Amino acid sequence: MRCGLCPHRCLIPEQERGICKVRENRGGRLFALTYGKVSAVQFDPVEKKPLYHFHPGRPILSIGSVGCNFHCGFCQNYHLVECSVPLSPMPIPDLVRAARREGAVGISYTYNEPLIGFEFVMDCAREFRRAGMANVLVTNGYVLPEPLAELLPLVDAMNIDLKSMDPEFYRKICGGTLAPVLDTIRESAKSTHVEITTLLVTGENDSEESIRAVVDFVAGVDPEIPLHFSRYTPMYRFTAPSTPPARLAAAHRIAREKLPYVYVGNYPLEGAENTVCPSCGAVVVRRHGYRTDRFGLAGNRCVSCSAVLRFVV
């Protein structure tokens, strides 16, 4: 039985599972083993996804399960990838009620790779759309065009990991390929709000050349896509030291040459969390950790100069 969800296109023998560990061949049919089962449910600031230009300051219901179709040696959630945490059943109506009760903007499919649980995400997304709430994907983007096209009409925002522009990085470190991720970014940016995150791993993808390659790609898709550089810390199989602050500052400086919305996460780099109006230079959103003050925004316009900014509010 061949799976048609992600570019691995796993050929799965009877009673066995694909690379993601959550899709099993039973009698010539694929079963989604984690359907309706979650490893974590909590409310987060939407900035934690990270999404800085999508309903800033609002809470969002965040859910995750287990498994992944990548196996990155530096994974920050490796316990979920290895399916080593307990799962609890979670009916979709309960999620809708919880989000509504807490005044959440919607739901975020996050923590592990959500697209390997495609069927549950689809069903959940339909119910949240009917309830008038948003659907957010935090994803590695490793999905085939057909399922992506089916899901995108239900998606209101995405944060997509772009780990590197080096195909060898994806092959050796992640166990995947780069091209499908780039295709996902290009296609998603046509129809929904997209932000990009690059984890800068010391000695692997933090050179100036690597950073410029990421920036050039994002600028080529749409220069107004917000780009987040995140600080790596030693985790799982990687023991290299944490990303030096100087590299984070350099990445921010390099990216700002071509992109107006560039941020640094997991490290308090002065000014690198705030949003500045590209037209007049005024600070429109000030952030400290996950605390957000959108004092300079009126809707999606700059209060100082009335320029329309790339925000969904």
Regions found by a protein language model. Give the residues of each.
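Short cysteine/histidine-rich metal-coordination sites, predominantly Zn2+-binding motifs
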Residues: 19-29, 34-41, 85-95, 291-303
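Glycine-rich active-site/cofactor-binding loop and its immediate structural neighborhood
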Residues: 60-66, 70-103, 108
